[in-house]
A protein has these predicted regions:
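Conserved nucleic-acid-binding Ia/Ib motif block in the N-terminal RecA-like helicase ATPase lobe
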Residues: 2-44
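Conserved C-terminal RecA-like helicase domain
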Residues: 13-24, 186-265, 293, 297-306
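Conserved helix/coil segment N-terminal to the catalytic DExD/H
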Residues: 29-67
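Conserved two-lobed SF2 helicase motor
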Residues: 38-54, 238-241, 260-273
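Post-DEXD/H (motif II) to motif III coupling segment of the RecA-like Helicase ATP-binding lobe
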Residues: 76-135
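Conserved interdomain linker/interface between the two RecA-like ATPase lobes of SF2 helicase motors
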Residues: 104, 115-123, 127-194
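A short beta-strand element within the Helicase C-terminal
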Residues: 265, 272-288
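Conserved small/polar residues in nucleotide/adenosyl-binding loops
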Residues: 315-317
Length: 317
């Protein structure tokens, strides 16, 4: 979520700064003083942070200035953040009714099956304020391929999944950028190293290496700047990793390298799926189960999570 906030804040800042509009981000990584908040026209923040600010009934001088509330990824209502979003919306609507002070509430989502229910919750006039776009509005057609593994033993299944991932990566290596989603932080580096080692054993590593001297120089300098040891090791081979356990500087470094097409394969957790705009030609979702520590068992990914990852791809495996 912090990665999304940082990206959106930078995007709006670059677009609005020429017009004198001040944009700031407000998260656990970046704090703002009351004076800075008062001078800010657009605040990009997380639900939890805005919940803390808006619930202070003793000081509403800043929240009363808000005239537009945009909730990106509004489908998070079904997630653990759902109650926080509900509280923010309810608090905003109550303030509008008490003060007769209108605030426009906009909800955005790429994966919202029950959009009519959410529209009703946000008090949207469905005749004029509800916009729904089906898949045929997508500018690039999406081809999906699902591969089922019948192996029951965990170790063999993981090995087979690695082999299938390598085969699919090699179908596009050297031609298109590839984004691979894994479901744990450790698995990002393990998967990237497996792909590198497998390609090296088959003498096929050249297809992943930068083809231009400029990209090679960029990756060499990036590897020197990277703080994560696994990232430093992998960058020189044209591979990148991305997860919430990395420093913000490393995450932004990887995002810039992938956007600049300097690295060909990026292995990530779901942090990239939730709003960071890094589309790839091919997306591989390595496994459809994620470990839930609260339930102490493996659970299937929700349809919303799958669709979020699909949204970054032209091809899903």
């Amino acid at each position: 979520m912090k990665a999304l906030v940082a990206e959106q804040a930078n995007h709006f800042r670059s677009r609005l700064e020429p017009f004198g509009v001040v944009v700031n981000e407000l998260t656990g990584d970046s704090q703002l003083t009351k004076a800075q908040i008062a001078e800010t026209h657009v605040i990009v923040t997380t639900p939890e942070k805005w919940d803390v600010i808006s619930r202070k009934s003793s000081d509403t001088s800043y929240t009363n200035l808000v005239r537009l509330l945009i909730i990106d990824e509004v489908h998070l209502l079904h997630d653990d953040r759902g109650p926080v979003l509900e509280a923010i919306v309810a608090r905003t609507i109550r303030r509008m009714e008490q003060l007769n002070d209108p605030v426009r509430i906009v909800g955005l989502s790429a994966t919202l099956p029950n959009y009519q229910d959410v529209a009703a919750f946000l008090r949207v006039d469905t005749a004029s304020g509800l916009l729904y776009f089906e898949s045929n509005y997508r500018p690039c057609p999406l081809r999906q391929e699902f591969i089922g593994l019948t192996e029951t033993k965990a170790i063999k299944r993981l090995q087979l999944m690695n082999e299938v991932t390598y085969d699919k990566v090699m179908e596009h290596a050297g031609k298109n950028q590839i984004l691979i989603f894994t479901h744990s932080r450790k698995e990002t580096a393990k998967t990237a190293k497996f792909l590198r080692d497998s390609a090296e054993a088959r003498e096929a590593l050249d297809v992943f290496l930068p083809q231009t001297g400029t990209s090679r120089d960029v990756l060499r300098e990036a590897a020197e700047d990277a703080q994560d040891a696994n990232l430093r090791e992998l960058l020189q081979y044209g591979f990148g990793i991305h997860h919430a356990g990395m420093t913000r500087a490393d995450r932004e470094l990887v995002e810039d390298l992938f956007a600049g097409r300097h690295i060909q394969v990026l292995v990530s957790t779901a942090t990239l799926a939730w709003g960071v705009n890094l589309p790839a030609h091919t997306v591989i979702i390595k496994g459809t189960q994620i470990y839930n520590p609260e339930k102490s068992r493996w659970c299937e990914l929700s349809p919303q999570d799958m669709l979020q990852m699909l949204g970054l791809s032209l091809i899903h495996i």
